[in-house]
Amino acid sequence: MGIVKIKDKTFKTSIPEADILKKVQVVADRLNQDYADKTPVFLAVLNGSFIFAADLMRMITVPSEISFVKYASYEGTSSSGSMKTLMGLNQDLTGRHVVIVEDIVDSGFTMAHMIEDLKKKNPASIEVCSLLVKPGNLKVDLDINYAVMEIPNDFIVGYGLDYDQEGRNLRDIYTIVEE
């Protein structure tokens, strides 16, 4: 089991990259089946989902598009609950099937805000595809039909997720070690 130190925190390996990729493939297969007769628009939420989105999109075999949006609700190790749009979407989504690609759904505030913003663009449908979901920490009611993994309410880094902007490049997912 690997241990990494990022700034003032210590993390241990909790989900190896090989396990992540196997589970991403399962979700990609479902998306390929469900969108076989559609051309979905995948909206990757930056910065955290960039590695997940890249791996997922290489597994998607149906015609599709990808765009990027950026929201922020994290500072340090806890979700602030505050919301601001940093980089929006300029693409016309009218009548399109939208799949939001997110790294982690924690409190759900960011995702609920994004869904409300996207509904104003009149898409045919909106689905959520999240690498990780913390069901025990959800504060809002969300339908997450494409969850790769559910995890406990631990703080994690790696595979795109960060601690104060560091650790995104780690290939595995690491859980904080309580000191």
Protein language model features and the residues they cover:
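PRPP-associated nucleotide enzymes
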Residues: 1-179
